[in-house]
């Protein structure tokens, strides 16, 4: 009994256990773009080298079931300064005109929810070579007690490149080398990484005055040509020198026209002049021509530093700077400071009092202040002092100090700021001192401590200030660190104490501080108050949309949960079915008392009539949000299996092919059992589709279903639609496009013949060591001027669309030239193999057709297995060649050119299979019809089912 059970368990197919054919994702990165070099010697460090501005194409080839989703990400490379990430959800990553900053490591992440994701990477190295920059530096040193001077010249050549460039120095047309003579030295400076080379000319001699060329090269990597730069060294070579037509600080009035000239006083070669402005660009309307800068009708915003720079690549650039100051007065403020020694915050007779006045002026130190009392100039005395630049106040501030305040000191004080002799208008500020002048207080109006508004509405926060004079109110956030006000400022001034917001958002909720300013009022400790802003916003729910599947007759529970909202509670929940209002479901008393955070609807048994769209509208008295449920007993979509090995079976003689379509059913137990599938097949660019019904038995999770599509035309592609059907009706459809691909010749498949219909020619490659290549063609692609009386008119099938491989022996081919076509590498798993193929050898100059076996067991060894020479007639003939490889091997078709141009040789329909060759030649005109499949096959299901019945009968 135990033995029988063990046998039964062993016969159960693997895919029927656990997850079936579900498999975790696997990935491999291949390149398909304009790569220069792809180094793959070290698998852990694959490097893809590409030239800048070329097109990068990387493909992530994935396997696994269900079909994995692919995501590309990138980390920084050598040419990038910081981490970067870009996500591309596609199996092919394509970057047009790649830049050097896009180099780095690219990761392909494939995941399908089974197991762990597969992650592969490749490093992209972007190659480039910029134009070199050559600068000249000179030093002069005294030698032997000032009897004569030695002049040394350094020619510094710098270039940005990847890989590091090689430098070649030339004097005229002669190449210079390190220590070529006592006057030449070539070296790399410290703290450089190969991007700089210096040519040092010591104790300059007459022959050193010449033309010098710095040539940089990356050794033609990626086809990047060399670049060079030339400099003519003479005895007059000198760095630039400058002088300005104005002083370095230029003060002007607004509205004036400003002209500054930057004059060259030296430099050979002739330097180039350039004007710049900091901060920002030159003002609008400014004109820089050579060394002349003109600014018409200058304004205060045009103030700043203007730089004139001269460069001629000799020495350091010469630079002169003009600080342009346009006179202006703005932002007049005052401060009332009670007696600081007595730490008083009020004005009291008998104590000191200070009045301060400040304006923002350009230039600040040139502003002049005047004080007036009751309209008359204030006269200084022992009790009235006027000071400037108080260290406790902003720079260039004027203060009027009243010592031992008397009643007679009460009055109106006026501070006037001006630029004497300038058309800039004066700026003044007035301060009233009396017994009613009191420090400020601040408070929040009654009922305004908490402001509640809806999101998107305007809001107004208010603080009331009392006192004389009333200072401005400053607003800031309290509860959030580094949080900004709605205006984007950290601190905002309001003259009336009201902070206004046009449209509030939920992020603006929180506590706001209002405080008195210490200017335009008393210079005392700031008074503060706080206002709470509460923003109500509609609820957010989950799921916003959910697909609910259940078998007919089973119960269904729908739940709509509140994620967030203000207020955070459900005030009401309304359910609708297909737009019709449903009676409210019962609510538990506990949930009603606490305020529920979700709404539920229960269906006792799902029926066709109760299938459809359900909506739950949740409200919190501010707004509402909706959960949408699509409830049905529809079957989920099939999951196509993309990892079928060699799904294409071609039948060359009938010009048809078949395709093995495989799939699994997603979550088959979630709904009623699948009864059958409806298959729709449509040839691309055609309108008519063929529909077939595919009956199935009980489908298990992970079970691989299979159906063979027959009578497909080579080389057309087809669109496939597959729909499952249950007792409920049609389920979700899955679609894909299948393409005809020539199967790769594999010895494990006896019916796998290479017909050369696909451009990939079954993985065959041209040998790089031969004289010329095999050519793939058919009757439609033949050269109309081809040589007559040689070569086949069509392939073995006799149709003009069929392809074959041949050698063209016309000029410039010569006697004995060889063309070799090499198969993929096969792993030997049998002792004997048979190579079958058709050949066509017609023409009076036919050479030889050889079949070789390349063994890769210990090294590489080519062995002749078959050979044929001479004219064999204008017919296709078949050959069967037995081979006995001792290890991994390849087969090679070698065509040898004969004595003339009438010697074209062709091959077609190559088959490699295990076992001995047939004793009788197959009729080449016989058409073999491959068997189609009219019903799906449940892989291995029928086999182990029959075996189980047999074992049970045996046990009895």
From Swiss-Prot:
High levels detected in developing central and peripheral nervous systems with little expression elsewhere. In brain, highest levels in cerebral cortex and hindbrain at E15. At postnatal day 1, highest levels in basilar pons and superficial layers of the neocortex. In the developing spinal cord, restricted to a subpopulation of neurons in the dorsal and spinal ventral cord, probably D1 interneurons. Expressed in brain. A lipid is attached at residue 933 (GPI-anchor amidated serine). Transmembrane segments: none annotated. GO terms for cellular component: axon; cell surface; dendrite; GABA-ergic synapse; glutamatergic synapse; Golgi apparatus; plasma membrane; postsynaptic density membrane. PROSITE patterns: FN3, IG_LIKE, MAM_2. It comes from the Eukaryota. Its main location: membrane. CDD domains: Ig, MAM. Residues 1-18 form the signal peptide. The keyword rRNA-binding does not apply. Residues 780-799 are annotated as: Disordered. Residues 752-919 form the MAM domain. One of its GO terms (biological process) is regulation of synaptic membrane adhesion. Disulfide bonds join 60-108, 157-214, 262-308, 357-415, 463-514, 560-616. InterPro entries: Cell_Adh-Cytoskel_Orgn (IPR050958), ConA-like_dom_sf (IPR013320), FN3_dom (IPR003961), FN3_sf (IPR036116), Ig-like_dom (IPR007110), Ig-like_dom_sf (IPR036179), Ig-like_fold (IPR013783), Ig_I-set (IPR013098). Required for radial migration of cortical neurons in the superficial layer of the neocortex. Plays a role in the formation or maintenance of inhibitory synapses. May function by inhibiting the activity of NLGN2. This is MAM domain-containing glycosylphosphatidylinositol anchor protein 1.
């Amino acid at each position: 009994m135990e033995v029988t059970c063990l046998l039964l368990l062993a016969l159960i197919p693997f895919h029927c256990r656990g997850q079936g054919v579900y498999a975790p994702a696997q990935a491999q990165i291949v390149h398909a773009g304009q790569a220069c070099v792809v180094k793959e010697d070290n698998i852990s460090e694959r490097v893809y080298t590409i030239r800048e501005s070329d097109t990068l194409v990387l493909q992530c080839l994935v396997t696994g079931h269900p079909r994995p989703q692919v995501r590309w990400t990138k980390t920084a490379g050598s040419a990038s300064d910081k981490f970067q990430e870009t996500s591309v959800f596609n199996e092919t990553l394509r970057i047009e005109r790649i830049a050097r900053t896009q180099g780095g490591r690219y990761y392909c992440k494939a995941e399908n929810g089974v197991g762990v994701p597969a992650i592969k990477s490749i490093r992209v190295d972007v190659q480039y070579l910029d134009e070199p920059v050559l600068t000249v530096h000179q030093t002069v040193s005294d030698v032997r007690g000032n009897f004569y001077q030695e002049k040394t010249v350094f020619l510094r050549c710098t270039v940005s490149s990847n890989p590091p460039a090689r430098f070649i120095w030339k004097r005229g047309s002669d190449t210079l080398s390190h220590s070529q003579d006592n006057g030449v030295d070539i070296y790399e400076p410290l703290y450089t990484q190969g991007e700089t080379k210096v040519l040092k000319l010591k104790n300059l001699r007459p022959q050193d005055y010449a033309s010098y060329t710095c040539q940089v090269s990356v050794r033609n990597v990626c086809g990047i040509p060399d670049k060079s730069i030339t400099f003519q060294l003479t005895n007059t070579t000198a760095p630039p020198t400058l002088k300005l037509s104005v002083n370095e600080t230029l003060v002007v009035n607004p509205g004036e026209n400003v002209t500054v000239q930057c004059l060259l006083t030296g430099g050979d070669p002739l330097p180039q002049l350039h004007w710049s402005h900091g901060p920002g660009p030159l003002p609008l309307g400014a004109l820089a021509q050579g060394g002349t800068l003109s600014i018409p009708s200058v304004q205060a915003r045009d103030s700043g530093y203007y730089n004139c720079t001269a460069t001629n690549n000799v020495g350091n650039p010469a630079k002169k700077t003009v600080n342009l100051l346009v006179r202006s007065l703005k932002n007049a403020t005052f401060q009332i400071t009670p007696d600081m020694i007595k730490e008083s915050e009020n004005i009291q007779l008998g104590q000191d009092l200070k009045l301060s006045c400040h304006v923002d002026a350009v230039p600040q130190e040139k502003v002049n202040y005047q004080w007036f009392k009751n309209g008359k100039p204030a006269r200084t005395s022992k009790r009235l002092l006027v000071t400037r630049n108080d260290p406790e106040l902003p720079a260039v501030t004027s203060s009027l100090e009243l010592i031992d305040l008397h009643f007679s000191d009460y009055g109106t004080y006026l501070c006037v700021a001006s630029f004497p002799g300038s058309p800039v208008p004066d700026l003044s500020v007035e301060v009233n001192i009396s017994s009613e002048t009191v420090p400020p207080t601040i408070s929040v109006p009654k009922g305004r401590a908490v402001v509640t508004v809806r999101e998107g509405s305007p809001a107004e926060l208010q603080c009331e200030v009392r006192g004389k004079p009333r200072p401005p109110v400053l607003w800031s956030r309290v509860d959030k660190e580094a949080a900004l006000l709605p205006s984007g400022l950290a601190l905002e001034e309001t003259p009336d104490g009201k902070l206004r917001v046009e449209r509030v958002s939920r992020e603006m909720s929180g506590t706001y501080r209002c405080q008195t300013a210490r200017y335009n009022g008393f210079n005392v400790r700031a008074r503060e108050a706080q206002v709470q802003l509460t923003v109500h916003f509609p609820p957010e729910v989950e799921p916003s949309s959910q697909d609910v599947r259940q078998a007919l007759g089973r119960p269904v529970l729908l739940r709509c949960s509140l994620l967030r909202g203000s207020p955070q509670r459900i005030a009401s929940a309304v359910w609708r079915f297909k737009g019709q209002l449903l009676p409210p479901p019962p609510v538990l008393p506990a949930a009603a008392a606490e305020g529920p955070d979700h709404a539920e609807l229960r269906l006792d048994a799902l029926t066709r009539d109760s299938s459809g769209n359900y909506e739950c509208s949740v409200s919190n008295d501010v707004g509402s949000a909706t959960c949408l449920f699509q409830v049905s007993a529809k079957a989920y979509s099939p999951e196509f299996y993309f990892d079928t090995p060699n799904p294409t079976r071609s039948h060359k003689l009938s010009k048809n092919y078949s395709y093995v379509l495989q799939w699994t059913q997603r979550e088959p137990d979630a709904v009623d059992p699948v009864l059958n599938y409806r298959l729709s097949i449509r040839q691309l660019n055609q309108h008519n589709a063929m529909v077939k019904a595919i009956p199935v038995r009980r489908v298990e999770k992970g079970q691989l279903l299979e159906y063979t599509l027959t009578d497909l035309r080579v080389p057309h592609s087809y669109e496939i639609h597959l729909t499952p059907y249950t007792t409920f009706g049609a389920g979700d459809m899955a679609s894909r496009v299948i393409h005809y691909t020539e199967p790769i010749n594999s010895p494990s498949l006896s019916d796998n013949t290479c017909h050369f219909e696909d451009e990939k020619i079954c993985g065959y490659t041209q040998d790089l060591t031969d004289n010329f290549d095999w050519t793939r063609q058919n009757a439609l692609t033949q050269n109309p001027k081809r040589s007559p009386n040689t070569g086949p008119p069509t392939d073995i099938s006799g149709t003009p669309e069929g392809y074959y491989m041949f050698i063209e022996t016309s000029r410039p081919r010569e006697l004995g030239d060889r063309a070799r076509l090499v198969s993929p590498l096969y792993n030997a798993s049998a002792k004997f193999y048979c190579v079958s193929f058709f050949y066509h050898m017609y023409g009076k100059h036919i050479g030889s057709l050889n079949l070789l076996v390349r063994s890769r067991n210990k090294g590489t060894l080519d062995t002749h297995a078959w050979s044929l020479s001479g004219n064999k007639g204008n017919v296709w003939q078949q050959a069967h060649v037995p081979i006995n490889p001792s290890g991994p091997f390849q087969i090679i078709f070698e065509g040898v050119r004969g004595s003339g141009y009438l010697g074209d040789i062709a091959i077609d329909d190559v088959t490699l299979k295990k076992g001995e060759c047939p004793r009788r030649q197959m009729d080449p005109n016989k058409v073999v019809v491959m068997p189609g499949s009219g019903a799906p096959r449940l892989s291995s299901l029928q086999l182990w089912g029959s075996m189980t019945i047999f074992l049970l009968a045996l046990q009895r």
